[in-house]
Amino acid sequence: MKVAVLGAAGGIGQALALLLKTQLPSGSELSLYDIAPVTPGVAVDLSHIPTDVKIKGFSGEDAKPALEGADVVLISAGVARKPGMDRSDLFNVNAGIVKNLIQQVATTCPKACIGIITNPVNTTVAIAAEVLKKAGVYDKNKLFGVTTLDIIRSNTFVAELKGKKPAELDVPVIGGHSGVTILPLLSQIPGVNFTDQEVADLTKRIQNAGTEVVEAKAGGGSATLSMGQAAARFGLSLVRALQGEQGVVECAYVEGDGEYARFFSQPLLLGKNGIEERKPIGTLSAYEQQALEGMLDTLKKDIALGEEFVNK
């Protein structure tokens, strides 16, 4: 199994690469790419960690050598948020980066499963889909927007509030991956009850958690370490499913039946070909139903922005 990380010299990319080097199944290959000249050195650094995962690093304009034979491609390349920016402010720079990298994926490893981490995910996933479609290699069961950070934050914050162990929780989060489009389904956590005020406060905290980190880092970056952990969890789940493990479920932002929007985050059963089944979002509380209806305009605009970027 070969996993490629594009954007591997950045804060998320290095954290992700470290976790993959230590946690990928024995015999896996890990390929690191970034435009930054330090990237081969990051690979050398990680190569000293005693795990049976082969690692190579590539830098420069051409990602293709890193992509050859990749089964999974995780893309974290791009600029990070600064205080006062929201994820959509990143669009102008990151849209072009994602488009360029996906064009290289389309020609080099068109059958790979692709996880997009680069923000704004609501939009960059639409860009990736349109680029792959133009290249004639789009498979909607193999393109994912990685929203796992919203899930691990939900698990952490609920555990803190309710005195639970975070590992025992798995809060489904639907919608998109920014602001009001992030909707944790707190009503679906077995054996945990909330007051209306707790639901409103928790939902808001989960939606704004990225900003909490950006402000706490005081201009020194955005969420890189927790995002690296979230991306590793998603990437490792994908690898396990591709290798035939049964019953692997993760939420991610994918193209579905279009009931709510063309792309929508929901629980997915993963399998040997990517998505095996898009699972229903289940019964929502009145609060969740209202929040879902209230986000769809924003989500659809984010998606249209990505489609237009490629097709203009």
From Swiss-Prot:
GO terms for biological process: malate metabolic process; tricarboxylic acid cycle. The active site is at H177 (proton acceptor). Its EC number is 1.1.1.37. SUPFAM superfamilies: LDH C-terminal domain-like, NAD(P)-binding Rossmann-fold domains. GO terms for molecular function: L-malate dehydrogenase (NAD+) activity. InterPro entries: L-lactate/malate_DH (IPR001557), Lactate/malate_DH_C (IPR022383), Lactate/malate_DH_N (IPR001236), Lactate_DH/Glyco_Ohase_4_C (IPR015955), Malate_DH_AS (IPR001252), Malate_DH_type1 (IPR010097), Malate_DH_type1_bac (IPR023958), NAD(P)-bd_dom_sf (IPR036291). It catalyses: (S)-malate + NAD(+) = oxaloacetate + NADH + H(+). NAD(+) binds at G7, A8, A9, G10, G11, I12, G13, D34, N94, I117, T118, N119, M227. Substrate binds at R81, R87, N119, R153. Transmembrane segments: none annotated. GO terms for cellular component: cytoplasm. Keywords: NAD, Oxidoreductase, Tricarboxylic acid cycle. Pfam families: Ldh_1_C, Ldh_1_N. NCBIfam families: MDH_euk_gproteo (TIGR01772). Catalyzes the reversible oxidation of malate to oxaloacetate. Belongs to the LDH/MDH superfamily. MDH type 1 family. Homodimer. This is Malate dehydrogenase. The gene is mdh.
